[in-house]
């Protein structure tokens, strides 16, 4: 089932699917099993979400410790696969922290707000890329750092806002 466009903290978020069923399984295989080939399949669904204004793709990086643990940065894999299809560059503008407490899931524990540092200037027409949007706080933090107001994700779940 397709997810409707939404605005989260001033960021327009376009998602290919709701975070359920087969789409959720694809995200899980990419994110936690490091099946990198999933990114190519997922990019097929993401390409129509890019507008003509998209001039560069900026993946929202996974925390370094999780990249090591799971062997993949899902947003970078998606951005790379999508860039090949759309023939636009990937620019790694954002630097993630080494480690932060886990935010995803249903735990009622207080959330740690994500933050990023800018590695290189953000190009005009940059589109943020991530695998899934839940509350939108990660996208908003990335947007605050880069200035980009458009994000493309494979799936969307969680609260709207």
Question: Which positions does each model-derived feature cover?
Answer:
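Glycine-rich phosphate/pyrophosphate-handling loop used in enzymes and phosphotransfer proteins
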Residues: 1-161
